Amino acid sequence: MKTHRIARWAQLTAASCAAALISGCATMEEASTSFSCMLSRVTSSPDPRCGGPVTTGGARTPAGSAAGSQNERFARLQAALDQETAHAAELQKQAVQAMQKLPVRQRSVAGPLRTRPVPITDGQSGVTSQLQAFSSLSVDMPLAAKGRGEYTRAMDSLKDLANELADNRGSSTILVEQADADVSAGRVNTSSGTTQTKNGKPVNVRKKVDSGLPVGIERYTIEAGEIRGKL
């Protein structure tokens, strides 16, 4: 399963490298982080390894050509964002499949995957376009399965997603909603905190009591950091 996740992410990275907004795939190191570099240009925590935004060098560009380049940049960024959403959906699917052979009450259940419109401004033309980006997804995890290998594998998929989103976006959040009765009975860990990815990006872990959540269930919602800025 782990090998499958790595292979899948390698395919997505290669695809995003081919459609990069700028020449971010010139070296092997840049190729391995091309997706992150693409998104770093429109987040609040750009990666200095990715270089600066593309400039025209002061040359005048015909209006039609400028509009075409602008549209192409938006299209390529949207393609990268779509890949990020597809990869998130794949990891959610893996988290659910990992527990499908357990008894029904011990299986994880996929919740909604949400995207949101994000205004992105083209740094060369000043034109702003609304792009669609991954926002969050959730998976309900039964307490009865804790300690089993299947539960651990499902959690690994969710943690992988949170770490990848943090590296791509600058940060991510794991929101864990817990049933009131489980919190009162001390059946769940209610501690919040922050961890870091291998690249030093923060993954915030928040716990929240939800009176409407069924007893014996923790709802894990993986939220991506904000995208804002210019191409």
Regions found by a protein language model. Name each.
Residues 2-13, 17:
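Bacterial N-terminal signal peptides that target proteins for export
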Residues 21-24:
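C-terminal motif of bacterial Sec signal peptides marking the signal peptidase cleavage site
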Residues 155, 183-189, 205:
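Q/P-rich, low-complexity intrinsically disordered regulatory regions
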